[in-house]
Amino acid sequence: MTLPTTIYSFPAYLSRFSSTDKPVKLKFHQYARATLLSNRGRDHNCDGRRTVEIHKLDLSDWQAFNKLATRCNAYDGITMNGDNSFGWNHEATLDNIHAQKYNKAYAGARLTAELKYLLQDVESFEPNSKYTIHEVVLGPGYGTPDYTGQTIGYVVTLPAQMPNCWSSELPTIDLYIDQLRTVTGVSNALGFIIAALLNAYSDLPHDLKIGLRSLSSSAAIYSGLGFERVPQERDISCARMYLTPANHPDLWTQENGEWIYLRN
């Protein structure tokens, strides 16, 4: 099952809940399990400026998401409310704390809960699944040391030949982004995340293409990163798009073998 790629932005403060609300223990499906794999290497799991890092989650392992969930829920100012068994009903309460010009952005608890919800109903997430999930955390180059390691989103990828929505008559791609979720508060986070993804797949050619299917409301955001609509697109609700970073030197460059997103 391939779902449309969307961007979700969560506000930095939700006034309906207080940080004293009692968290609700999450329930999740047996497939919603993973462990963090060891980093691929210092040079290939982050963007060239170390603003964000990505870490693979291994769906073939039967360990639960406890490490990720525990780390997310331990952050100051986050409270989980809701249950994961019968539908989406989660909120994350974030204290209205500021760091430099950014709001406190690690709504990791909500993102983790949403990931569990996604996996709960996707039967193709089995031990032999071709999906790869990358957790996204803030890196040492973010500029605010206290935030290093905070979860800000995740990316789900598929090999280029796997997505049903990308037929052979469309431009040839090397990697498909099936899901991309991030939070507000980190300037240009989406570009940094894609740069980190490019570096994680360093075995792909320099002129690689990344494909995705975006909701029409998010297409302009991806266009700003250099993504182009496929010429044959007729679906008005979704837009299949692809990015060739090498064709956009004003946005993307390589230094010492690492992709860098040039917008600050």
UniProtKB/Swiss-Prot annotation:
The keyword Glycosyltransferase does not apply. It comes from the Bacteria. It is a single-pass membrane protein. InterPro entries: DUF2686. It is found in: Membrane. One of its GO terms (cellular component) is membrane. Keywords: Membrane, Transmembrane, Transmembrane helix. The chain crosses the membrane at residues 182-198. To E.coli YjiC. This is Uncharacterized protein YjfZ. It comes from Escherichia coli (strain K12).
